[in-house]
Amino acid sequence: MDQYSLGDEGALPSEMHLPSFSESQGLNCSDTLNRDLGPNTRGFLYAGLSGLDPDPSLPTPDMSSEVLEDNLDTLSLYSGKDSDSVKLLEEYADSESQASLQDLGLGVLKAKEADEGGRATSGSARKGKRQHSSPQNPLLDCSLCGKVFSSASSLSKHYLTHSQERKHVCKICSKAFKRQDHLTGHMLTHQKTKPFVCIEQGCSKSYCDYRSLRRHYEVHHGLCILKEAPPEEEACGDSPHAHESAGQPPPSSLRSLVPPEARSPGSLLPHRDLLRRIVSSIVHQKTPSPGPAPAGASDSEGRNTACPCPASSGSSSCTPAGPHAAPAALDTELPEEPCLPQKEPATDVFTAPNSRAAENGAPDPPEPEPDTALLQARSTAECWPEGGSVPACLPLFRGQTVPASSQPSSHSFQWLRNLPGCPKSKGNNVFVVHKPSAVPSREGSESGPGPSSGSPSEESPPGPGGGLEDALPFPAALLRVPAEAPSDPRSASGEDDPCAPKKVKVDCDSFLCQNPGEPGLQEAQKAGGLPADASPLFRQLFLKSQEPLVSHEQMQVFQMITKSQRIFSHAQVAAVSSQLPAPEGKPAALRPLQGPWPQQPPPLAPAVDSLHAGPGNPEAEGSPARRRKTTPGVPREASPGSTRRDAKGGLKVAAVPTPLAAPSLDPSRNPDISSLAKQLRSSKGTLDLEDIFPSTGQRQTQLGGEEPPGASLPGKQAPAENGAASRITKGEKGPACSRGGGYRLLGNPRAPRFSGFRKEKAKMDMCCAASPSQVAMASFSSAGPPADPSKSKLTIFSRIQGGNIYRLPHPVKEENVAGRGNQQNGSPTDWTKPRSTFVCKNCSQMFYTEKGLSSHMCFHSDQWPSPRGKQEPQVFGTEFCKPLRQVLRPEGDRHSPPGTKKPLDPTAAAPLVVPQSIPVVPVTRHIGSMAMGQEKDGEERDSKESSQQRKRKKRPPPSTAGEPGPAGCHQSRLRSPMFLVDCLLKGLFQCSPYTPPPMLSPIREGSGVYFNTLCSTSTQASPDQLISSMLDQVDGSFGICVVKDDTKISIEPHINIGSRFQAEIPELQERSLAGTDEHVASLVWKPWGDMMISSETQDRVTELCNVACSSVMPGGGTNLELALHCLHEAQGNVQVALETLLLRGPHKPRTHLLADYRYTGSDVWTPIEKRLFKKAFYAHKKDFYLIHKMIQTKTVAQCVEYYYIWKKMIKFDCGRAPGLEKRVKREPEEVERTEEKVPCSPRERPSHHPTPKLKTKSYRRESILSSSPNAGSKRTPELLGSAESQGIFPCRECERVFDKIKSRNAHMKRHRLQDHVEPIIRVKWPVKPFQLKEEELGADIGPLQW
């Protein structure tokens, strides 16, 4: 090997040699797989080759100095763990694989130890574009710590780690973060849901974000997920630079699953392209394949010489030169035939069938496929498009031919096949890892070199369990059994394959373009299942990163799940294959598997999507080829001989075309397919499922005109063989289905990336429920027409979850759409899960609770549900949850012919989607036709109506009050809220008849403003009358009370007219007659005599009123009105009025106008009634209804009156009453202290000994009027003034002394009169009931006397 130096641009000087391997050091891929080769790849770092110098201690291989410069993509491989030689090739290498490296001219890569601090790492470069560390793009190092990064964006993000500024603050908990994405991930912790669930057996932990889940896996399950740089946003195949950059494909990421002990702080995964080239070179060195085809090869042979070279060129092992490229790698001129430009991102699919398990007769347990996005599209990095030069790659260099000796026939390591990508899909490369038996056969490789002739495999007895078909999302054309490889190139390629010649040139249309008659994937599947020990290499070394919108953390988590569970489910296969954009014009998705898979283990119960090899169905159902290449107006080609596999693992031949097959195998004949794909790809963000599951209403039939039982459309509830989604709909739940069986919504490769695994959490765990805050925020979405898929935007709920929430389409019927070839509105009901999920028919918002949807509907005030149910909320899990919703019925019946429509049931009622406390009143339909939980009508209804243009709904007329409720009272006619939501009333809405709208519930029990509603008895209702045909109390989740009568009640707004509502106005008369007109009212009081002018008379009248309000009067203490009436009858004579009150009583004849007049306080309360009132008052406070029920002899009005009279006469506080006894005990001591505080002269002190008495806080004037004889007189003003001057403040009324003036002023309020009435009752509320003696004494006096 020549000495070379690529310059000093790189920040990390390194040494690299490619010495030859000895025969004993050959890499054995089977051992590699068995020994977990993949986890050790994380120990390698990357650095530019600009500073590489040869290592003099290593032998120089026979290789030119420009090899690495041209073919290693200017990247070198370092060991980040122990700085040894390349671990990938040395640690797990054996002699045979080392010899193969030596034959290929690939020596041992010697890496220099990385600088301290991990200068060669680019661990922070996880987001943004990764640039090549080439002399044109030198590595960028951190000026603070010296770490090396391949892009400026990675370096800028790394500098944040050195900064202490945290400008992104959480508004909820005020926690600050340096980066916005960290804050976004932190916000997930404030949700009430934990969608990231550990699916290890026996572990039920769940977390809010993927970081916590990853940490959980590392700590508890010993699994470690590496972070990586996400795939860069690459240009589509139609961009001009896609062809120019064929020699240097963009780097792509590689994820690995390693034990915690294998991690190193600054390590980064090895470059995937480099590793793939190296291993592909090794494999194809060992793979027996024919030599280069002669220049004059026939069309059929040229078609089959797609991969005559043993090594892969670029990222594809079968990458022939384009029509404009020099065929140096093949040393032959390949036929040039124009093909369509690339339209879809490339996709790498990897398979690792193991024949050993099949040979042993034991089925290998299936392994969960990587995340649904794991096999996402990739762009130009994966294949070399048409017109690009052949990228020279190890070990096939420009101008070199591979000698036959470099292809040994005997080998014991697994061979890997890197099939080229389709030119229109930018390299759908497929890795196939297969371990043949010890004695491989060469006759297949010697026979006609078909598209997969370079990847021979051996046929083994099929395993009884789930084969590789359960796990591999591509047909068997990739796995050619050597013994069955057709020798006839024409038969191998197929006569009806017009694109066969292109398989040689432009990546040979690699993705699953298999020909009729070729052995399908079943032969390879019969060779055995995927071994558990092959998973590390399968997942870590060759798994490509996804299209730019894919979250790389999700891939890591799913790889971790894959390793821990080792279960491949059909649902996951379908989900993954749905992410594989197939080449336009290629045969579309595979048919689903027939049969319910009775032999599968429980985890595989929901797995339905399997892979059936065949010319017409080379792709898995649900794949983009099947989802996107759906042009109903274009005839499909159905190829006979479709190889299918039954549930027992055997082969099953059925001439069944794909339901959504491509129009033709020749893309040139269907140019609108690529335009359709481009249109779909141009949509921003996430596409609605209607973009991905076009339910066209057309069902492809066989050539003979029959429709197979399994050929049902997506969106059709069919038996288990019709798709994973239909099985999921039927409730067959499984771990893989519930955790990883979702479909990834494809987006624009150029669309902005969203970081974090939370973008994919809905796909990871479709059972996750929305938190109440999410439902509340999402409920504010405005109503509107169906969102345009090309302008689809993320809802609030999806933004919270990172932008990848399922935006379900409206339940539409697509017969008319199929006629127009419109693919934008599909019905994805076959994709549902057995969990109740509700979708707003107006805005496609998804809700996990019925209450969330019902509350959300109240915000669509201008677009309420139609009474005919044209727009129904979609219900997930039709077998499980049908609460007040109609189950969305897929198009037609399962047995109906294609395109048949079911007429809409005119009596099918709409779902009740109303907020709480809103009445529902139907108009024209009977109660039996309502939609309160009638699933039958809902299931029979198709989704046709919502495809029509939505019309604004009119507000329905308000409902009416019904008959008396359970309590015996008429239900109120109050209405709430402003709109009376009633989807059962002709779809018409009216405003509330009352202004302003009442706030109380319209159906509440009890009286209201509009109490007794008069019911009309007319049999025919006028336009303003409604039939109140209500149901019983509806679902408790709604909280709706409904009326149960069928009376016809008019609730039209009107003005109440009549003597009951308006006063009668007398006729107008002359003013002169007013003086002679006698007043109809009786005069009961007027000032007599000189009462208006004489002050003495006024004083006498005032004294009479005071006496009448005192306890002297038997009638009560506040009968001022009675005193005035008596004074009026006495014509102003105060003495006569007083005698009337005291002696005779105010007795009036029956003819008197006031004979039946009831005076306040005139009721007589017996002692028993008083005692009961006190007990009731202490027990119920001011609830006079309960007091009345306890007394039973007094009405509520009498109890209220007694309370207020009592309150005026006695100042009591029932809350402080229990402390009276303590107060009584303290008052004697207060008296003593008061006497000590009262200042007096020394000579007065001996003669003054006041008698101690209880100083209650009642209105006691007796303390002044009737003090003991030996008590001194009141303090003189001088004495009081001197006392105040000394800081002592005595009361002038009761001689209490206070230390503060404020205390005395507050105390003086007790001595004030209430309403000019002298408080006479001076007895405080006793704690104990009154003694009978006291009651007897008080029974003779008035009701307020004690």
Swiss-Prot record:
Domain of life from the UniProt record: Eukaryota
List compositional bias (Low complexity) regions by residue number.
294-323, 440-458
| PROSITE patterns listed in its UniProt record | ELM2, SANT, ZINC_FINGER_C2H2_1, ZINC_FINGER_C2H2_2
InterPro entries according to UniProt: ELM2_dom, Homeodomain-like_sf, SANT/Myb, SANT_dom, Trans_reg/Corepressor, Znf_C2H2_sf, Znf_C2H2_type
Q: What effect is documented for mutating residue 712 to L?
A: In a breast cancer sample; somatic mutation
Query: Which stretches are tagged as biased composition: Basic and acidic residues?
Result: 934-948, 1234-1247
- Pfam families on file: ELM2 (PF01448), zf-C2H2 (PF00096), zf-C2H2_6 (PF13912)
One GO biological process this protein is involved in is: spermatogenesis
Which keywords belong to this entry?
Activator, Developmental protein, Differentiation, Meiosis, Metal-binding, Nucleus, Repeat, Repressor, Spermatogenesis, Transcription, Transcription regulation, Zinc, Zinc-finger
Q: Does the keyword Transcription apply?
A: yes
rRNA processing keyword on record: no
Q: Where are the zinc fingers (C2H2-type)?
A: 140-162, 168-190, 196-220, 838-860, 1289-1311
Q: Where in the cell is it found?
A: Nucleus
* Biased composition, class Basic residues, residue ranges: 1248-1258
Region (Disordered): which ranges?
1-34, 113-136, 235-271, 283-328, 437-472, 578-744, 931-971, 1224-1281
Q: Tell me a GO cellular component.
A: transcription regulator complex
Q: Which residues form the ELM2 domain?
A: 1053-1145
Amino acid composition bias (Polar residues), ranges on this chain: 21-32, 671-685, 1264-1273
The GO molecular function terms of this record are: transcription corepressor activity; zinc ion binding
* Domain annotation SANT: ranges: 1160-1211
| Annotated function | Transcription regulator which is essential for male fertility and for the completion of meiotic prophase in spermatocytes. Regulates progression of the pachytene stage of meiotic prophase by activating the expression of genes involved in meiosis during spermatogenesis. Maintains the repression of pre-pachytene transcriptional programs, including meiotic double-strand breaks (DSB) formation genes in pachytene spermatocytes and suppresses aberrant DSB formation after mid-pachytene, thus ensuring meiosis progression.
Oligomer status and interactors: Interacts with DNTTIP1. Identified in a complex with KCDT19, HDAC1 and HSPA2. Component of a histone deacetylase complex containing DNTTIP1, ZNF541, HDAC1 and HDAC2. Identified in a complex with HDAC1, HDAC2, DNTTIP1 and KCTD19.
Protein name in the entry: Zinc finger protein 541
Q: Which organism is it from?
A: Homo sapiens (Human)
> What gene is this protein a product of?
ZNF541
